């Protein structure tokens, strides 16, 4: 660990010197680095897909959709839009401040720490890295040890493409993360669990370092069968895809549980079963399209969630586990107890509880008994229900009539609220995430108002009162001695 401490200290010293040199403030440099990330992904597509298969059993199509494609688009958007993002924003000042001028400029924080996650180890590393570079920072990326092949790829390949004095990669486990967090950073970006997020935030507080925490939570899906019955097949496919089709439920925005009226629950279950088979075949364990569970620890965690006798009794499909093959069968539960652990912990796996309600409007109350989720999904064409969801719940995002697609849309901010996260990124929001917006005001020495200065009197007090109210006509009368 002494060697790692020295490595971290030397990396920090070099990155700070590089930032102080001003090199990273050049838009040309930023575009070149982002372009290099694009080329790195394009040149190494097969290697990346192989790493993701080795780590998580991801099919190459899923890997491109959820990881490589995301990074390539992020890089393209950043290069094409960076000039516009970086332009100072001129502010229209109130007449009260005439003839002063105001603007806001985006300046980089400095040296940034990015701590990425294991479930999407390429996109959750390179996406924030692109944002940090676009804003002009130097960056140290700590990849996740739980995706060792993807982590090794990043550690080996990034230095071959990017400026090694400004952008560095360090591998390692919690002990390395602890060393990193003992140092002062200008910004910390973390993707992971709320439990670790609290540790990150506590460490950042020692230096008053700003943080962005991309966490998770139990993302509910409301199914209002009354208004979407004509499209129910699409609804079922989207729910199944949102639970099992993206890292096998190991995603912070996966469908965690479904809320549906009791009368329609059997129909939904009967439609989900053949949909799962159409996606993954009769034996999902042998399917090349179903990602595996990350490691034995997570298999055991999921097994523990299912071990509650009350939860066992609610299994209506699946439930088998093969720890040696890191396999948990796609599983459907019908009405597990709301006080069970599985209904109070983010599942992060291929288990789908279906919770029934008498009336779909009651689903809002159930959502509000839990911490604010990263996403709420609702399949409905009822405008009143949509309005209630938006006004009576709080979440990082709300998506109607689809699932997870909001993550791909860089025109929208992505981030949580409360226990599901702090801050937002994607597209322009990534640039803002890694930038400090500095207010600039340029005054004039050509006009000086004595009302600003002591000694105080009633005239000056009246002047100040009117100025705060922007009562300009009355101010003129006051100055002309026509109103007191």
Curated annotation (Swiss-Prot):
Tell me what reaction this enzyme catalyses. an aldehyde + NAD(+) + H2O = a carboxylate + NADH + 2 H(+)
Q: Name one GO biological process term.
A: aldehyde metabolic process
Q: Where does NAD(+) bind?
A: 192-197
Which Pfam family, giving just one, matches this sequence? Aldedh
Q: Transmembrane ranges?
A: none
Keyword tags: NAD, Oxidoreductase
What does UniProt note about where in the body, tissue by tissue, this protein is expressed?
A: Constituively expressed at low levels.
Annotated CDD domains: ALDH_F3FHI (cd07137)
Q: Which residues form the active site?
A: 214 (proton acceptor), 252 (nucleophile)
Identify the residue position(s) of the site Transition state stabilizer: 119
- What's an example of a GO molecular-function annotation for this chain? aldehyde dehydrogenase (NAD+) activity
Q: What is its EC number?
A: 1.2.1.3
GO CC, any one term: plasma membrane
InterPro entries hit by this protein:
Ald_DH/histidinol_DH, Ald_DH_C, Ald_DH_N, Aldehyde_DH_dom, Aldehyde_DH_NAD(P)
Q: Which SUPFAM superfamilies match?
A: ALDH-like (SSF53720)
Q: What induces it?
A: Not induced by abscisic acid (ABA), dehydration and salt stress.
Subunit structure of this chain's protein: Homotetramer.
The family note in this entry says:
Belongs to the aldehyde dehydrogenase family.
UniProt name for this protein: Aldehyde dehydrogenase family 3 member F1
């Amino acid at each position: 660990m002494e060697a790692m401490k020295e490595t971290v200290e030397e990396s920090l010293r070099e990155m700070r010197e590089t930032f102080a040199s001003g090199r990273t403030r050049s838009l040309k440099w930023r575009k070149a680095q982002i372009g290099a990330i694009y080329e790195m992904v394009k040149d190494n597509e097969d290697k990346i897909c192989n790493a993701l298969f080795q780590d998580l059993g991801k099919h190459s199509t899923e890997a491109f959709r959820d990881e490589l494609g995301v990074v390539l688009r992020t890089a393209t958007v950043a290069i094409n839009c960076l000039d516009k993002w970086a332009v100072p924003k001129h502010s229209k000042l109130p007449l009260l401040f005439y003839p002063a001028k105001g603007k806001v400029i985006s300046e980089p924080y400095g040296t940034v720490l990015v701590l990425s996650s294991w479930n999407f180890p390429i996109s959750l590393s390179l996406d924030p890295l692109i944002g940090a570079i676009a804003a002009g920072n130097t960056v140290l990326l700590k990849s996740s040890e739980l995706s060792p092949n993807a982590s090794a790829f990043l550690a080996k390949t990034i230095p071959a493409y990017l400026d090694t004095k400004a952008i560095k990669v360090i591998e390692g486990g919690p002990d390395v993360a602890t060393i990193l967090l003992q140092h002062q950073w200008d910004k910390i970006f973390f993707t992971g669990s709320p439990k670790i997020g609290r540790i990150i935030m506590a460490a950042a507080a020692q230096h008053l370092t700003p943080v962005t925490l991309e966490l998770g939570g139990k993302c509910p899906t409301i199914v209002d069968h009354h208004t979407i019955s004509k499209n129910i097949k699409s609804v079922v496919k989207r729910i199944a895809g949102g639970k099992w089709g993206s890292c096998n439920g190991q995603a912070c925005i996966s469908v965690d549980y479904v809320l549906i009226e009791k009368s329609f629950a059997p129909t939904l279950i009967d439609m989900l079963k053949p949909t799962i088979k159409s996606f993954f075949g009769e034996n999902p364990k042998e399917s090349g399209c179903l990602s595996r569970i990350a490691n034995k620890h997570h298999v055991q965690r999921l097994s523990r969630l299912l071990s509650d006798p009350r939860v066992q009794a609610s299994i209506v499909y699946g439930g088998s586990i093969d720890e040696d093959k890191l396999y948990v069968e796609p599983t459907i539960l019908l009405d597990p107890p709301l006080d069970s652990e599985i209904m109070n912990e983010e599942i992060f796996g291929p288990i789908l509880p279906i919770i029934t309600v008498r009336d779909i409007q009651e689903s809002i109350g159930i959502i509000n008994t839990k911490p604010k989720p990263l996403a709420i999904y609702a399949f409905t064409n009822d405008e009143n229900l949509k309005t209630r969801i938006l006004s009576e719940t709080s979440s990082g995002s709300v998506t109607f009539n689809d699932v997870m697609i909001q993550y791909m849309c860089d025109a929208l901010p992505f981030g949580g609220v409360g226990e599901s996260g702090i801050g937002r990124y994607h597209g322009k929001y990534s640039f803002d995430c890694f930038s400090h917006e500095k207010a600039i005001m340029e005054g004039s020495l050509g006009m000086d108002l004595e009302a600003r200065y002591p000694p105080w009197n009633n005239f000056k007090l009246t002047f100040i009162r009117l100025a705060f109210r922007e009562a300009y006509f009355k101010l003129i009368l006051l100055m002309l001695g026509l109103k007191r």
